[in-house]
Amino acid sequence: MDTSQVRILPKLDISAGHNFTKPSKRINESQDVAEFLSSKAYVDLMTFLLQLNRSLFPTKLPDGRVLTWELNSEAVEYSAPVRQLQQLLSKLEAILDEAPPDTGPRRFGNISFRRWYEMVESRAASLLEECLSKEILQMPSSDPGAPTAEVELLAYFLGSWGSPQRLDYGTGHELSFLAFLAGIWKLHGFPENSPGVEERAIVLGVIQPYLELVRTIIKRYTLEPAGSHGVWGLDDHSFIPYIFGSAQLAPAISESDRIPEEGSLSDAPAPGGVTKANVVERERKHNLYFSAIGFIYDVKRGPFWEHSPMLYDISGIQAGWAKINKGMIKMYNAEVLSKFPVVQHFPFGSLFSWERDPNAPSPAADAHIAATTRRTDEASTSSYLYSPKYIKATSWSYGSYKGALGNISTRWTGSPWRFYVCRPYANESSVG
């Protein structure tokens, strides 16, 4: 596949004129999710996610050598915008000292999180001005009465840290941070570079530090999971480290290769290593997937299969990390982007538009489908994301599970996404 055909999130054509607008809520009921999945915002978010995902696959050089992209890799160079975002995260971490956890009795999250969030909210504009370029923040609208780009970036930035009302954090907040970075990308905030170079720096230099800060916040203020499936969800709070971390351990690719669907890097730890504390402790310093697993070990007690059954099931997959990566992207579509409790608070402006994408298929006749997604393979045609699949989760039936935790007695043998039933459009083949 020609690298020119790899989909990249388009940047704004400033010369063509553009009007920014304050992002607002558009997903008010479950039926609105289908509209979201046909929107320009959905396409842009998935394009950026897949763009970042591809950059984390090990790189096969023409001379046969393989470059891997571990956490803290010296081979990854951080551009000035990435370093500025790192400074932004450091400033947010410093504000934690100004809001020590409340020592009084509580049933759920610590109310001091509200104080921390209020401080961040009151300083957000100045923080962005200190750490982002003026050209980005003050990019004007064509209409003199319309706001600058700052109003849109600010909305996604503030949506990235959890809910001060509910004292929770979840994948919807994680999605908001992804949108914040994608918005900067669309505004030409990251430099032009060779394919994958800046994307890797964004993941390893910004997203991973963001995840680490969020984990500190969760532990410090005992934030509840937001929009979680409980024990039957992948993770209480995050999803994207499992996508990017599995990519880090997949087979190496050249610039012209398609993303592999099976296999692993030759010296990658086995997926089953997540159940072994010593392996997790060793690998969490190098890999996003194991870093996320390590946080689970930090905050949960008891057998891994009991508190993280979905991840335990995935650990038994024999087809390698590329298979896991593919499944994670499917699951992200179905369990994050297609779930009303997760995306209901995502706001839409001009950078992430509620407007229908011209390549989107007609809405499904069945408005009550529980989860809706589209094929996420890299594509070389204008129909990139539009091999539409409507996916519905069947009842969970793992091993001898009967509906209560105590009834699990056998290790599951299938990948969790095999329990999604695909109903393809027209003559489209079903998701693999």
Curated annotation (Swiss-Prot):
PANTHER family: SERINE/THREONINE-PROTEIN PHOSPHATASE 2A REGULATORY SUBUNIT B (PTHR10012), SERINE_THREONINE-PROTEIN PHOSPHATASE 2A ACTIVATOR 1 (PTHR10012:SF3). Its main location: cytoplasm. It is found in: Cytoplasm; Nucleus. PPIases accelerate the folding of proteins. It catalyzes the cis-trans isomerization of proline imidic peptide bonds in oligopeptides. Acts as a regulatory subunit for PP2A-like phosphatases modulating their activity or substrate specificity, probably by inducing a conformational change in the catalytic subunit, a direct target of the PPIase. Can reactivate inactive phosphatase PP2A-phosphatase methylesterase complexes (PP2Ai) in presence of ATP and Mg(2+) by dissociating the inactive form from the complex. InterPro entries: Phstyr_phstse_ac, PTPA_C_lid, PTPA_sf. Belongs to the PTPA-type PPIase family. This is Serine/threonine-protein phosphatase 2A activator 1. It catalyses: [protein]-peptidylproline (omega=180) = [protein]-peptidylproline (omega=0). The lineage of its organism: Eukaryota, Fungi, Dikarya, Ascomycota, Pezizomycotina. It comes from Emericella nidulans (strain FGSC A4 / ATCC 38163 / CBS 112.46 / NRRL 194 / M139). SUPFAM superfamilies: PTPA-like (SSF140984). One of its GO terms (molecular function) is peptidyl-prolyl cis-trans isomerase activity. One of its GO terms (cellular component) is nucleus. It is an enzyme of class 5 (isomerase). Its EC number is 5.2.1.8. It holds the Pfam family PTPA. Signal peptide: none annotated. Keywords: Cytoplasm, Isomerase, Nucleus, Rotamase. One of its GO terms (biological process) is G1/S transition of mitotic cell cycle.
